[in-house]
Amino acid sequence: MTQEQKLPVVAFKRRQTLENSVFYMNSLLTFYAESKDTGGGFDVAEWLGKPGNEPPPHVHEHGHEFCYVLEGGIDAYVGSDVFRVAKGECLFIPQNAPHTFLIRSPRYRMLFFTQPAGLTKYMRAMAAEPALQLDLPKEGIPYSAADIQHAIDEGRKYGVRFLSPEEVKEQLPSYPGMASPEEPNP
């Protein structure tokens, strides 16, 4: 039993504030429920990004991910599948499924759930700083310019494994790479 599973779970209400938001890879990330809040059951967070803020191809070794799009749209690459996901639509990504996405709109906002909890611990470890505003940071370092070894090392601690170029070619055959799509689709 983990330390979080031993904590009492109590009802709560939360909204987006500077106190529960961070700048993460040139994006805004707001934590609504984390492991310590849910007895290790799940995480819920909101992510606001723009083209160029996408994560490298990766897998979540410890849990499932469910995303609900609040604004904009993406092309999600999950194994050999490609899903165009827009506002009002959702996407489920099972544990250990190789995945990433490309943002197809000027801004992209999603609510995501991970089960069991733990992914937000990785995101906190990678966060550049507390949010200074409840919008995209004016400046920041996206994954493409980040210290990738640090991301790999932190990911290992929290069950996030980044794929090698060879694994990407084999496991995400339709993924075009980190270039932005030619035709944004709001």
Where are these regions (language model features)?
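Jelly-roll (double-stranded beta-helix
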Residues: M1-M25, D37-F42, P51-G63, G73, ...
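Short glycine/threonine/proline-enriched tight-turn/helix- or strand-capping micro-motif at secondary-structure
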Residues: N26-Y32
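Structured binding elements
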Residues: C67
